Amino acid sequence: MKLCGFDVGIDQPLFLIAGPCVIESEQLAIETAGQLKELTDALGIPFIYKSSYDKANRSSTKSFRGLGVEEGLRILQKVKDEIGVPVLTDVHEDTPLDEVASVVDVMQTPAFLVRQTNFIQNVCRQGLPVNIKKGQFQAPWDMDQVVAKAREVGNDQIMVCDRGTSFGYNTLISDMRGLASMRQTGCPVVFDATHSVQQPGGQGTTSGGQREMVPVLARAAIAAGISGVFMETHPDPENALSDGPNMWPISRLKPLLETMKELDEVVKRHGFIEDQS
């Protein structure tokens, strides 16, 4: 599959979707996009910048949601123009999809909306690549039907993304077998290494997270066989306005990316026995 000018797939080099959880300010967006571009260019990792203009799925009405669609899209356009990177953002049921599609390069659907047929198909009708997140409540093989809905409206630029599975209260678990199952959709599989360590609602009015486990799950997912990694990152996660406990610090990103790239190359050089009939 062609994505933002580069090839993605289980037989292609690992790509990265990364950026702060939410657009906090124009300055933060420009600075983080620039840092991430510099890092990924140096390592030769294809890169898409990610940040959200609105976080609809919040633990509390007091949680920061973002700058809104108009200001958020203006900033994402500026990131594209000044930094020269493709951009991704997530959309919701009340999103003006045509406005978003006029700016971004990739759309992303939230995990909690994965079974909303009209929503999934309306997003896919925009004609852009779509990263569809698997619901935390959903079996990996059930993504077959979600992909079928997307393809029914003529969109073959579909990625499927695993962000963990509910495991009791306030806890997620990552079953690496699910990544192999999701490969059977024929779509590039993306692993969300930061939301997978989230503890949803675990701090009462906000979600917690086990940031120290991000590298563990990222390495495991790459060893299992994926096309790309989704990772939210921030210069100061402790003071981030959204999802700080599970974001990875930009200052510690380079060694992690180096490990991820090397591991991906080794795994893909040997292929995947489980996919051979």
Swiss-Prot record:
Q: Name one GO biological process term.
A: keto-3-deoxy-D-manno-octulosonic acid biosynthetic process
Question: Which superkingdom does the taxonomy of this entry point to?
Answer: Bacteria
Q: Provide the Gene Ontology terms for cellular component.
A: cytoplasm
UniProt xrefs under Gene3D superfamilies: Aldolase class I (3.20.20.70)
Which reactions are catalysed by this chain? D-arabinose 5-phosphate + phosphoenolpyruvate + H2O = 3-deoxy-alpha-D-manno-2-octulosonate-8-phosphate + phosphate
Pathway, per UniProt?
Carbohydrate biosynthesis; 3-deoxy-D-manno-octulosonate biosynthesis; 3-deoxy-D-manno-octulosonate from D-ribulose 5-phosphate: step 2/3; Bacterial outer membrane biogenesis; lipopolysaccharide biosynthesis
EC identifiers of the protein: 2.5.1.55
UniProt entry keywords in alphabetical sequence: Cytoplasm, Lipopolysaccharide biosynthesis, Transferase
Recorded source organism is Hydrogenovibrio crunogenus (strain DSM 25203 / XCL-2) (Thiomicrospira crunogena)
EC main class here is: transferase
Q: Does the keyword Ubl conjugation apply?
A: no
Short name of one Pfam family for this protein? Answer: DAHP_synth_1
One Gene Ontology MF term: 3-deoxy-8-phosphooctulonate synthase activity
Query: Of which family is this protein a member?
Result: Belongs to the KdsA family.
InterPro entries to which the protein is assigned, alphabetical: Aldolase_TIM (IPR013785), DAHP1/KDSA (IPR006218), KDO8P_synthase (IPR006269)
Localization per Swiss-Prot or TrEMBL? Cytoplasm
Q: What is this protein called?
A: 2-dehydro-3-deoxyphosphooctonate aldolase
